[in-house]
């Protein structure tokens, strides 16, 4: 079975033009089948502020009202997605930009009230149709997927990019040996946020619960790890959380980097 790397990039990489350009050059050089999933929350937040709309976040997830939905659709599906595609094309990586609505790749349902919180137009993934992605990969085309899905009734939904990446990984397990990689600005999951070298090399479900209870893992890292363990339990070959600069070492040079998520 062929390998497939599903790589999610986020954090400060998207916001830093030099870091993003360097990362995309590395991504383009990867020899295996690959899909890129991107976030972009900080860009959307800046544009929201400029328009007088204050971003609201709960546990790393954005609350999306009707006006914010317009902004994230423009920013995620347009500005960020197409800039990434253009940069990949300049590195001889034939990429195509997509949302979950394109080719009906990813259907979601609007999240119901959760603990009294109305997340607005936020989608919880209910169905992934991997065949269009399999076809694109077979033609040597690299999908670049924005964190937007649709409800099947004409409404776009903002969807956590980590979730999009893990759901794609699970859906493509039947066709590929899928490896899920979360790339951001840190070297991995840190035991001490003040010590950027305090990388936790492996985390299993038991140590994850312990790290959450002691506050070592919190905020936006929680949905990332929740999605990671869901993917492992569903048959994804490996999940790595690492620094964007380590991507070539990990994939082309087969080196050990970052934090690896493992089953008990």
Swiss-Prot record:
Its EC number is 2.7.2.8. Pathway: Amino-acid biosynthesis; L-arginine biosynthesis; N(2)-acetyl-L-ornithine from L-glutamate: step 2/4. The keyword Lipid metabolism does not apply. Keywords: Amino-acid biosynthesis, Arginine biosynthesis, ATP-binding, Cytoplasm, Kinase, Nucleotide-binding, Transferase. GO terms for cellular component: cytoplasm. Disulfide bonds: none annotated. Pfam families: AA_kinase (PF00696). It is an enzyme of class 2 (transferase). This is Acetylglutamate kinase. It comes from Cytophaga hutchinsonii (strain ATCC 33406 / DSM 1761 / CIP 103989 / NBRC 15051 / NCIMB 9469 / D465). The lineage of its organism: Bacteria, Pseudomonadati, Bacteroidota, Cytophagia, Cytophagales. The gene is argB.
